[in-house]
Amino acid sequence: MTDFDPNQVSFAQGAVRIEGVIRKHKLDLNKIMTSRDQHVRAALKDLGVSNVPKGFGKVQLPFVFPQSQFFISHAEANGKVGEHAHHGGDALRFIAAGSVTYNGVELTEGDWMYVPKGVSYSLGIGARGATMCYCYCCCCAGFADVRDWIVDPGPEIARH
């Protein structure tokens, strides 16, 4: 066994740290943030993690999700995602490959984008396409995707 112990701090203690950093840096969780934003980069300096195995670096991100579902998506080159919002909850998008453009800023491999519940946005897809991992506090699947799995789908799902 190594000296690395990932169980030193509880989820709640980690959330308290994040709340403190949000206050210190006056981050607005009602606005979209990306890893390219200067004010976010400053906050991340206070969220570095030293409890990692040798040869690793780690930073905690400046938000907490109480529950979430994960998705991976692939987008064709030069595509567009029209203006939309996620009304069920906050979302986090990691760019795994390729690139997307949000509000004139290109996000590339390793970048991320936090999207608060209900905030509208659109994206452009880069020349190499994009592979993204999403963490949603909502589902984002369609009615047809869940219909066969729901015991009592209710009228909203049943009519689709």
Predicted regions and their residues:
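Hydrophobic residues on conserved beta-strands that form the core of alpha/beta folds
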Residues: 70-72, 95, 132
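Glycine- and acidic-residue-biased ligand/ion/polar-headgroup-sensing regions
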Residues: 77, 87-101
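Short His-Asn-centered micro-motif
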Residues: 96, 116-117
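Double-stranded beta-helix
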Residues: 1-15, 122, 126-160
